[in-house]
Amino acid sequence: MDTISNKTGEGGVIMVALEDLLNWAERSSLWPITFGLACCAIEMMGAYASHYDLDRLGVIPRNSPRQADVMIVSGTVTFKMADSIRRLYDQMPEPRYVISMGSCANCGGPYWQHGYHVVKGVDRIIPVDVYVPGCPPRPEALIGGILKLQEKIKAKLTYS
């Protein structure tokens, strides 16, 4: 309570810079669109369930890329899917972020060596901000990736 009273004036209003307020709002309300494939998508659904409850972190899934600011790509990405992933990414408004979840999305997974149809990492299609390792990664790992993305947004300096 002492820290809040130090920031408020006599009127009880907290004074902050507009950039700090925008940064707080951006990192506290991440709205992802999920591109879930295979077993990583099951773990992602577990992260949204009541035991982990991503809503408490401000992470609310969206159905449209035009409403989302985070794309979570999980599972094996094939060359036929690459255009769809790029199209969804291009439809997202700025600022937009990408989380690559699981070994398959990160580097092609167990299929990278002999799979002619597998993209060797989603970062060859779209820029990736956070990589979540694992095969499949546990919901705790996805939550750790979301927290890492929030730290990355917090470290962003300006809104120009």
UniProtKB/Swiss-Prot annotation:
One Gene Ontology cellular component: respiratory chain complex I
Main location: membrane
GO molecular function, one term: iron ion binding
Subcellular location, record wording: Cell membrane
Membrane-protein topology: Peripheral membrane protein
Family annotation (Gene3D superfamilies): 3.40.50.12280
Alphabetical list of PROSITE patterns matching this protein: COMPLEX1_20K
EC numbers: 7.1.1.-
UniProt KW keywords: 4Fe-4S, Cell membrane, Iron, Iron-sulfur, Membrane, Metal-binding, NAD, Quinone, Translocase, Transport
Cofactor binding, note field: Binds 1 [4Fe-4S] cluster.
InterPro entries (alphabetical): NADH_UbQ_OxRdtase-like_20kDa, NADH_UQ_OxRdtase_20Kd_su
Leading EC class: translocase
Catalytically driven reaction(s): a quinone + NADH + 5 H(+)(in) = a quinol + NAD(+) + 4 H(+)(out)
Cofactor entry: [4Fe-4S] cluster
Binding site for [4Fe-4S] cluster: 39-40, 104, 135
GO terms classed as biological process: aerobic respiration; electron transport coupled proton transport
UniProt-listed NCBIfam families: nuoB_fam (TIGR01957), PRK06411.1 (NF005012)
Known role: NDH-1 shuttles electrons from NADH, via FMN and iron-sulfur (Fe-S) centers, to quinones in the respiratory chain. The immediate electron acceptor for the enzyme in this species is believed to be a menaquinone. Couples the redox reaction to proton translocation (for every two electrons transferred, four hydrogen ions are translocated across the cytoplasmic membrane), and thus conserves the redox energy in a proton gradient.
Complex formation: NDH-1 is composed of 14 different subunits. Subunits NuoB, C, D, E, F, and G constitute the peripheral sector of the complex.
Record family assignment: Belongs to the complex I 20 kDa subunit family.
Identification of the protein by name: NADH-quinone oxidoreductase subunit B
Organism whose genome encodes this protein: Amoebophilus asiaticus (strain 5a2)
